[in-house]
């Protein structure tokens, strides 16, 4: 049976916890996991490739959700060929450096309202390499687009009001406006953001740093010295600013977002524009 083959190839039964006494119950649990995960892996006719849908009954493939689920659905179960197709699917509709965060329920138009989906793609690629070591696939099919995404984030992305760019003062990423929601907190009421997070969001900059380190690693692997130096420089600058600006010593936590505040009077006192929950 297909389910038994997938279980055997995945090696999941070898991960039986030492304190889990009922081996048969664990095997049944693994089978249920395989069956359940299969329901989210679908074939997209428009691309002739597999993709991951975000949920039932009506969600299609959402960039953020699909890429978060990527390792658990495909890599742990060793479905590497399908994993490659999902990565290729994510790349097909990239526009101005943005991976679509979803598709319209009417007509299937790509929606670009996410600052993190493109950055999550880098982590998915990194995990794929950890499981497969197939650097040739990444080099031949994904790397050029990954490089383009980084360049767009640096130079600026205006598509659909995303307002994403690198602040050259601190090498952190700014995203959004007071009218847009392009992080995971994307709820709106009457087109007004419920939790405005425009500015420098903590997870966006953590993912940005991660993406830069992954690009540094790839350039090191392929002996691209100039690229290695460039991405290391950007990552080091980002890390320094992140540690300095995002840590809240009073609450011993990270600030959630650093707002962009424009002072009318340059001599006015600086306002603490950092927010924690």
Regions inferred by a protein language model and the residue ranges of each:
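A short secondary-structure junction motif
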Residues: 40-44, 90-97, 156, 245, ...
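A short, charged helix-loop
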Residues: 178-196
């Amino acid at each position: 049976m297909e389910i038994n083959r997938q279980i055997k190839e995945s090696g999941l039964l070898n991960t039986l916890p030492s304190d889990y006494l009922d081996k048969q119950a664990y095997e049944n649990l693994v089978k249920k996991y395989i069956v359940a995960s299969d329901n989210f892996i679908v074939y997209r006719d428009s691309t002739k490739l597999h993709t991951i849908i975000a949920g039932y009954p009506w969600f299609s493939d959402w960039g953020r959700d699909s890429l978060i689920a990527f390792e658990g659905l495909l890599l742990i179960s060793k479905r590497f060929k399908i994993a490659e197709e999902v990565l290729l699917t994510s790349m097909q509709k990239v526009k101005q450096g943005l991976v679509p965060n979803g598709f319209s329920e009417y007509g299937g138009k790509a929606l670009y309202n996410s600052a993190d989906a493109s950055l999550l793609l880098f982590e998915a690629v990194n995990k794929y390499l950890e499981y497969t070591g197939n650097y040739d696939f990444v080099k031949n099919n994904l790397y050029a687009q990954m490089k383009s995404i980084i360049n767009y984030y640096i130079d600026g992305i205006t598509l659909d009001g995303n307002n994403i760019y690198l602040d050259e003062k601190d090498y952190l990423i700014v995203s959004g406006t007071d009218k847009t929601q392009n992080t995971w907190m994307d709820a709106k009421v009457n087109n007004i953001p419920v939790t405005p997070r425009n500015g420098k969001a903590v997870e966006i900059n953590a993912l940005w740093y991660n993406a830069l380190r992954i690009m540094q690693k790839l350039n090191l692997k392929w002996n691209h010295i100039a690229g290695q130096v460039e991405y290391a420089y950007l990552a080091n600058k980002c890390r320094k600013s992140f540690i300095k600006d995002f840590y809240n010593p009073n609450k011993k936590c990270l600030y959630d977002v650093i707002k962009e505040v424009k002072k009318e009077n340059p001599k006015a006192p600086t306002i603490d524009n950092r927010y924690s929950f």
